[in-house]
UniProtKB/Swiss-Prot annotation:
It comes from the Eukaryota. GO terms for molecular function: carbonyl reductase (NADPH) activity; L-xylulose reductase (NADPH) activity. Allosteric enzyme exhibiting negative cooperativity. Activated 2-5 fold by fatty acids. The lineage of its organism: Eukaryota, Metazoa, Chordata, Craniata, Vertebrata. This is Carbonyl reductase [NADPH] 2. It is an enzyme of class 1 (oxidoreductase). GO terms for biological process: glucose metabolic process; xylulose metabolic process. The modification Phosphoserine is found at residue 176. It catalyses: a secondary alcohol + NADP(+) = a ketone + NADPH + H(+). It comes from Sus scrofa.
Amino acid sequence: MQMNFSGLRALVTGAGKGIGRDTVKALHVSGARVVAVTRTNGDLVSLSQECPGIEPVCVDLGDWEATERALGGVGPVDLLVNNAAVALMQPFLDTTKEVFDRSFNVNLRSVFQVSQIVARSMIERGVPGSIVNVSSMVSHVTYPGLAAYSSTKGAMTMLTKSMAMELGPHKIRVNSVNPTVVLTAMGRSVTSDPELARKLKERHPMRKFAEVEDVVNSILFLLSDRSASTSGSSIFVDAGYLAS
């Protein structure tokens, strides 16, 4: 989806791979100046080669203090995509404190922190903005082994609504994109069992999983003025799964 974001500055977390990486590339092509945030420096090096001029930031968003040091002075941002996430699979009864804490620190707490940093700057500058939280279909339905992960995404749904309510008076829109399994490295690991993948795909009326481009297009739409009256909402990129 071709949009024009010329003159705007965007920040994308989880920018090293998959949805985040392709979002950075799409925003770059569309004229935005992009701050790309990920914890893997090698991914930033290759991304900078693909998208000359982006601003790479290497930080583990699961670390509150490190995130504050890295992004506290990031400067003016008009568009924010909270995409960073980990999918740590463990049965509910076996879920460890380490897995629980890591899941919530990266998937939810970092969204809270980075959004605070960006929104405060938007308000101080007196400019409108758009924030998109990359959630998941499992914010509404879940599967065995995803207790921690799906809990973070369910909480993100309410965080998105709360942010939209409180930031709306400042002309800051907040929405989420909630995809089904996306054919990224993370998505392929979740469906590495062929039988599980077959059964899961059959529950989608369109008999397919999502491509990265499908999710990126929804993110771009929500970032753009084409969704100027949309806030506190979720777009489900799920091939009809919830309808079934």
